[in-house]
Amino acid sequence: MAEHETPEPESVKLFEGMSGSDSGNIPTYDVTIRVRRYNPEVSDKAYWDDFNLTMYRTDRVLDALHKIKWELDGSVSFRRSCAHGICGSDAMRINGRNRLACKTLLKDLDITKPIIVEPIKGLPCEKDLIVDMEPFFQAYREIMPYFINDSNE
């Protein structure tokens, strides 16, 4: 299991001119994200990779994954789109529960232990956190969960 660390960011100043020593600062904390990695071009076996990050209190799991991809390991693969909990493209298992990475705040998880991030179950894994959604969409098309208008109006 590989470990990666990011440099510690300075706290962010929200409002200039506020009184108090920490007024307007967003506190930071250290967190370990444990990502289930899988690359069929390299091996048919999955493995775990730990990433040690310093994150802000307002960050979500998606922010941590972005930080990992952009600053530590560009090969980490995951889906994301709207980042507002609408599209569902960043669905994954976070600490054993199916969740949206864009809606899950890190501060709501137990950060004293590694946060486990893995692909959702029940669909074939293509790479890292990306699953093949075609079986889901095929079942969706078969049940036709929408209205069909037979009239010309």
Each predicted region: which residue ranges?
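Signature of N-terminal electron-transfer/Fe-S-associated modules in redox systems
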Residues: A2-E153
